[in-house]
């Protein structure tokens, strides 16, 4: 069970093998063996140290998000880290070029999934299928050029061209605005939030597999930037795009440039309903195998 806490004034505790949730209007008790994870989406929530110890013992995550969807903290047991040999392989791959090859394959997968997302959108918007299919074909062509790239700038150039085609097609066929991470419209706020949830999911698997979240291959090194996480999450972004587009963001989703708490909770619940986390775990495992030189990475397909 995914426990989503979206309201102020909630208190989380532990008693007799159960998660105890105290809130206005009553108390809920959930046996801890039924809890998969706790999502805290707002401030004003307290959590007891006794519960933290119990959650750690049962390997249950607690993840905190700010109002924009940024994962700001995560509680997890210290034993949840993989072997150090994976980090060594990760660092060596930066020098041997194996890491760059991984980044190219992930970016290739992202573009192919963008093309697939447009075709799927065309099934929902039959009157626009031709225009969406045409944009999808152009993006697939750009994806086909990535394996021959010799440097990061080449990859980023094709990725940027594909993004322009992709969001232009989405905007023209849905009536939704284009992609602008700094915009305060409901679509972009929801995408930012969804990408934040995705970022957490990939980050979690990177840590579990013993990788360094900050040592990536495409996203530039910067203090505090989880470059590897940003690299690996790229091919999953079209999943978030389709999820948000399907929900049809509207003006009543936001208040003061921030998504309402109930909308944030809905996005988390929709994300968990997609059941993508086992897929993400598999893909991170494939990335580890690639970094060790055991087998070439196989991108995920939408």
Curated annotation (Swiss-Prot):
Binding site for Mn(2+): 159, 219, 234
Disulfide bonds, paired cysteine numbers: none
GO molecular function list: DNA binding; endonuclease activity; metal ion binding
GO biological process per UniProt: CRISPR-cas system; defense response to virus; maintenance of CRISPR repeat elements
Tagged with keyword Manganese: yes
Cofactor dependence: Mg(2+); Mn(2+)
Lineage top rank: taxon: Archaea
EC number: 3.1.-.-
Alphabetical keyword list: Antiviral defense, DNA-binding, Endonuclease, Hydrolase, Magnesium, Manganese, Metal-binding, Nuclease
Family membership: Belongs to the CRISPR-associated endonuclease Cas1 family.
Protein's job: CRISPR (clustered regularly interspaced short palindromic repeat), is an adaptive immune system that provides protection against mobile genetic elements (viruses, transposable elements and conjugative plasmids). CRISPR clusters contain spacers, sequences complementary to antecedent mobile elements, and target invading nucleic acids. CRISPR clusters are transcribed and processed into CRISPR RNA (crRNA). Acts as a dsDNA endonuclease. Involved in the integration of spacer DNA into the CRISPR cassette.
Subunit structure: Homodimer, forms a heterotetramer with a Cas2 homodimer.
Name of the molecule in the record: CRISPR-associated endonuclease Cas1 1
Organism: Pyrobaculum aerophilum (strain ATCC 51768 / DSM 7523 / JCM 9630 / CIP 104966 / NBRC 100827 / IM2)
Encoding gene (name): cas1-1
